[in-house]
Amino acid sequence: LLSRRQRQMCIRDRWTLLALFTICIYSCKDDENVETETFDPSKPVVISDFTPKEGGAYQKLLIYGENFGTDASNVKVKIGGKEAIVINVKSTYVYCFVPSGAFSGEIEITVGEGENSVTTTASTAFSYEKKMVVGTLCGYRNNRDDQGWRDGPFDGPEGVKCCGFSDNGRLAFDPLNKDHLYICYDGHKAIQLIDLKNRMLSSPLNINTIPTNRIRSIAFNRKIEGYADEAEYMIVAIDYDGKGDESPSVYIIKRNADGTFDDRSDIQLIAAYKQCNGATIHPINGELYFNSYEKGQVFRLDLVDYFKTIKKGESWDPIVKNNPNTFKQLFTIADPSWEFQIFIHPTGKYAYFGVINNHYFMRSDYDEIKKEFITPYNFVGGYKQSGYKDDVGTEARMNNPCQGVFVKNPDYTGEEEYDFYFVDRLNFCVRKVTPEGIVSTYAGRGASTSLADGNQWGTDDGDLREVARFRDVSGLVYDDAKEIFYVHDQVGHTIRTISMEQEENTAGDENMPEDESTVESNE
């Protein structure tokens, strides 16, 4: 459903297109009249009007006036000091696109070159509206793709600034410090820390005690009265079957006294079965849910049982098969070999199960009496049907849906106040799902940039749908206080952002990341 603001923008765009169409018809009928007049440097260039009066980047803009000539290559348009792309020119109008970052809105047109050029400025400014755009926070990929992995600052020359990010990743904010963003990888053993305040990448957790480099998820505990403070522990799931059905699956890592996590932190095995794709914590009641790829099992563990055992000085038995009452198997979601992860609604009343290798999401509702999730049902996407299609429910198509996050929508009222955003890895984009199951594309697959090389994937920053492109995106989180998405772009080897565009010289603004565009080839 379109918001009131979106409907107004659609109506405005239609009037703009109608105006352009009318001018084009007039031009065709009267092509021997003033519309074919060439630029005369002895006469002034005049801007008499423009439409629409307001809009954002890549808005189509029609500027009326006199003495523009007919050669588009001879006309330069600047809006807010930024050069605009000129599409068409006739003597009495210029058709162009509003450039990104045209904050002041001042319209300036220069016709001609050198001494024969004439410049004029519109008497009123275009009202530029900021919009959400894609940026690049850190990381890069050079033309040889041999930059490797390097901890370090976000900024600086190649060989100094940080790089890596080249395995399938998952992101997680530290609940006690939103400037600390952790990332783990299916293929790289270290858990890395993206320090947003100090603009630095480090690898504090190399966790050499775990038997695999397949780290699938990061979560944090809720407060458990008498046992654990809020986010005192990090919960890490690994994908391993080297010990059959006694293979380590979920670890619990205690935060250091100084509030950090690193290789000094105490790490304990809390659950062992096999092939765990992820673990998550119920946001209200705090129980732990984890799964197995083997048969699509979902297990539940009340963390109080673990902490009681440890507090009494007893040994904890993490073997799932030995403790069926402690590790309760709730259900299997479908068939064997289902690679999936669980994303719980902030209210805890339901969860989406993202089935990565079978290209759809299921929904499971929460039994508040038993305090557990019930057998899920298909929600959006086609069961075992990969593809790309924005649609409703099971008619939508996706390809390798990965990490997702619930984001509050201020246009909604009542309990269903959240949309669900997820990265559609092999469709190279970020998608959105409404509570009703309407799937749409939010960012990526740039309409204009993809025309240049025929690819839906790329490294382009800018307008969400017109310009921005990703490649194999796998991680996604959202900072609701700053209203910023952070996206892990695996093949681009970068951390990307989706945030409201900012005027230049705001690098010191604590509310926004200082992005830099990544222009290296990602072929």
Short names for language-model regions:
Residues 468-523:
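Blade-level signature of beta-propeller repeat domains, shared across WD40, Kelch, NHL, RCC1
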Residues 24-27:
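C-terminal motif of bacterial Sec signal peptides marking the signal peptidase cleavage site
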